[in-house]
């Protein structure tokens, strides 16, 4: 999955008139909404926790969208004849990290990768597999150990070079072959030990043979972008890790070609005339970096950008703008915070290694109140690592945690963390004090860690909020492991519930997403066993057990299931984004057009 953006997600994974520079009319309207908000869910409770001024600031920065109604997952179908030409500008609150097709772990990078590199299959808005480079879904043997794909005829890369089965063999070889182990791929832990061979009997046929069943292969791993062997085939696996292709992909096969990347500002793409499905309607697509989601909403209003995901505090207002479609829908995503459980990080390990301490911290968070104060009904408190739209979701996961300040304090007392003279708990001479990071520019998450700081302080725990650049956050999680606590989101473009890279020891190594260094042999065993069959009736109980274990252990407590919020200029048509195809399935961008052709 993809550590989201939130989180996006994520996962995980940003203006004139923002929360710091608003007009008097906007401020008055916001305060009126805030007053109604207080009346709705307990003025006394919120003021007690945050104080009047802080409550108002949190409201303005975090969610004036309480009264907004839910909409469908895409723009209304249009009978207009597509207009050729023009450009579309999409605003995003963080820059991309790279075009590392087989290793990108952030949603920003995944989004541009799927614009430039198609896989054998794609994913529809509802999660269904759809053929892209493959002419149809694969033929699968009765024992689920052999997958045979037929490629579409006359496939080409953007430079006109033929795309054949050999390119598929080359790409997948980087993810499982022993001789390519020096190449870092986040998917190696999912495929190594399962794939026996990938062969090309002829230029149009690819055969995957497995030594044992890998149940998530079809729904999770057939969408990997296919790389050009004629460009990268002579590069050693180790050298490939730092090859400039990942920042300057000169040859692609997706709907758009890469033009340039102005870091911190924009990524520019042009129509790929050699695209297998025909050239896109748009001449140009621009990924614009707008590092503040409030500013992003303002740029939607002014037309500086055409589409984007606005800050929650601006969403209700966007619904009143006649030039914008404001859309919201459920997403396969959760927002969570995770601890650094690496024993080598002695300070963090001393605080967080005891699961009862982790339980205490989670019980101290008033999540229903937080959901209303920050998300305003566009998120629901979460209890499971699986999302409700997943077939493996356990609605009766156990244990579940209610807000219990007294219970949290007792757990900390029992664990030997006693309050010091300044009210902060101490054990063996160490103060219970740590830094919590999230991605800067995401106002909802910045507000969340502020509220978490306040509520943890009430039980004698000192948290120091520190928002940092998203790509720095990703580096801390996946590479340096220098964090103490991180809050972020996980967004998945996959419909398979496998989370091996997130919670098992396989995900601790290079390229994995288990940056918390969580180790539980039973989770490892159950996750592996769940991949040994494609029978959902057999897999489901195993995932239920995993959810119970992670709910009890809380290495990365799940806070919320957020909704997608989108603003789309009405000049944009066929922008058919949905729950599953936002980051990992952008082939539909071929049919997007702008009515003025500009």
Annotate each PLM feature:
Residues 136-182, 207, 296-299, 351-353:
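Aromatic- and charge-enriched surface segment that lines or borders ligand/interaction sites
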Residues 91-142, 173, 251-253:
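N-terminal lobe/hinge region of extracytoplasmic solute-binding protein
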Residues 89, 164-171, 203-209, 254-255, ...:
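Alpha-helical secondary-structure segments
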Residues 1-45, 60, 65-69:
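N-terminal secretory signal peptides
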Residues 244-247, 272-318, 332, 450-453, ...:
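Ligand-site clamp/hinge motif
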């Amino acid at each position: 999955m993809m550590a989201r953006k939130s989180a996006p997600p994520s996962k995980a994974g940003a203006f004139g008139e923002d929360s710091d520079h608003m007009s008097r009319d906007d401020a008055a309207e916001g305060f009126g909404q805030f007053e109604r908000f207080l009346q709705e869910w307990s003025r006394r409770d919120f003021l007690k926790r945050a104080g009047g001024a802080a409550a108002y600031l949190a409201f303005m920065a975090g969610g004036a969208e309480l009264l907004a109604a839910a909409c469908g997952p895409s723009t209304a179908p249009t009978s207009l004849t597509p207009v050729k030409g023009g450009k579309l500008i999409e605003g995003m609150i963080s820059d991309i990290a790279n075009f590392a097709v087989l290793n990108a772990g952030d949603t920003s990078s995944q989004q541009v990768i799927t614009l430039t590199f198609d896989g054998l299959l794609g994913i529809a808005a509802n999660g269904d597999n759809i053929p892209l480079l493959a002419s149809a879904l694969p033929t699968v043997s009765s024992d689920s150990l052999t997958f045979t794909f037929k490629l579409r005829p006359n496939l080409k890369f953007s430079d006109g070079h033929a795309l054949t089965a050999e390119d598929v063999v080359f790409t997948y070889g980087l993810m499982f072959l022993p001789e390519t182990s020096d190449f870092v791929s986040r998917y190696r832990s999912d495929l190594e030990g399962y794939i026996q061979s990938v062969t090309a009997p002829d230029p149009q046929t690819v055969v995957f043979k497995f030594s044992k069943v890998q149940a998530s292969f079809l729904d999770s791993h057939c969408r990997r972008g296919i790389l050009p062997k004629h460009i990268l085939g002579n590069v050693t696996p180790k050298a490939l890790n730092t090859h400039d292709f990942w920042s300057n992909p000169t040859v692609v096969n997706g709907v758009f070609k890469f033009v340039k990347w102005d870091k911190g500002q924009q990524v520019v793409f042009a129509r790929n005339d050699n695209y297998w499905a025909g050239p896109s309607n748009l001449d140009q697509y621009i990924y614009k970096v707008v590092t503040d989601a409030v500013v992003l909403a303002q740029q939607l209003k002014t037309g500086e950008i055409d589409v984007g995901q606005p800050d929650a505090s601006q969403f209700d207002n966007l619904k009143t703008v006649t030039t914008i479609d404001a859309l919201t829908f459920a997403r396969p995503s959760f927002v969570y915070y995770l601890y650094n459980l690496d024993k080598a990080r002695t300070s963090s390990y001393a605080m967080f290694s005891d699961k009862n301490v982790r339980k205490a911290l989670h019980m101290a968070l008033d999540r229903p109140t937080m959901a209303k104060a920050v998300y305003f009904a566009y998120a629901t408190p979460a209890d499971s690592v699986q999302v409700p739209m997943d077939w493996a979701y356990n609605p009766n996961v156990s244990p579940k945690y209610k807000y219990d300040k007294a219970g949290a304090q007792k757990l900390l007392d029992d664990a030997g963390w006693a309050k010091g003279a300044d009210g902060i708990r101490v054990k063996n001479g160490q103060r219970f004090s740590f830094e919590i990071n999230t991605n800067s520019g995401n106002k909802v998450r910045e507000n969340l860690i502020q509220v978490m700081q306040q509520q943890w302080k009430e039980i004698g725990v000192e948290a120091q909020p520190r928002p940092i650049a998203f790509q720095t956050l990703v580096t801390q999680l996946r590479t340096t492991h220098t964090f103490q606590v991180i809050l972020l989101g996980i967004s998945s473009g996959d419909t398979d519930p496998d989370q091996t890279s997130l919670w098992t020891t396989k995900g601790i190594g290079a390229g994995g997403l288990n940056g918390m260094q969580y180790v539980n042999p039973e989770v490892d065993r159950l996750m592996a066993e769940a991949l040994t069959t494609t029978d959902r009736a057999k897999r489901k109980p195993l995932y239920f057990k995993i959810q119970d274990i992670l709910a009890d252990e809380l290495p990365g407590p799940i806070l919320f299931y957020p909704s997608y919020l989108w603003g789309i200029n009405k000049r944009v048509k066929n922008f058919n984004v949905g729950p599953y195809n936002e980051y990992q399935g952008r082939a539909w961008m071929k049919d997007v057009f702008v009515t003025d052709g500009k």
